[in-house]
């Protein structure tokens, strides 16, 4: 969400939308942002392959294809363990050239991370760490999306709260 990004990063952020913009416009918008940055991060929407209807039109996958961007997939691991390998394999092989290069495991137990890391590596992915489950750590949502950054109580503390990295 651009409001969260702007607040956390203390900079203006933008939007790339393949539903409303053609490929050239998307590449031009990204190139303008890249000129003034050392790194550019594109946050995906919904499920990685989810677009209009039962297609990839307007999906994060489509943006990755248009921009030739490597993808770091965030996988919700709450309630799963060994199935994480199947989830990763499914995402990386569902479409040819998925662009998925790395993974961050969300809501993962520290004890399970070594096995998840190995599963990712066996698929040629770079495991970039995990975020442990924290009671009260999830951001609230409502119909049509998350609450705004200004509505989150203790925003800075919650965003800064412990996460494990493996860089």
What would you call each of these model-derived segments?
Residues 73-76, 104-106:
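Conserved beta-strand segments of the P-loop GTPase G domain that flank and frequently precede/overlap
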């Amino acid at each position: 969400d651009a409001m969260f990004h702007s607040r956390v990063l203390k900079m203006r952020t933008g939007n790339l939308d393949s539903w409303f913009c053609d490929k050239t416009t998307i590449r031009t918008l990204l190139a303008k942002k890249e000129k003034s940055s050392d790194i550019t991060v594109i946050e995906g929407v919904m499920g990685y392959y989810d677009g209009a209807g039962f297609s990839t039109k307007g999906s994060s996958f489509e943006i990755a294809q248009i921009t030739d961007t490597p993808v770091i997939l965030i996988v919700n691991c709450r309630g799963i363990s060994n199935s994480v390998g199947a989830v990763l394999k499914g995402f990386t092989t569902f479409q040819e050239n998925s662009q998925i290069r790395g993974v961050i495991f969300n809501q993962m137990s520290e004890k399970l991370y070594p096995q998840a890391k190995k599963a990712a590596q066996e698929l040629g992915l770079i495991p970039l760490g995990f975020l442990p489950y924290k009671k009260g750590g999830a951001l609230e949502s409502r119909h049509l999306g998350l609450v705004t950054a200004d509505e989150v109580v203790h925003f800075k503390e919650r965003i800064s709260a412990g996460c494990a990295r493996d860089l």
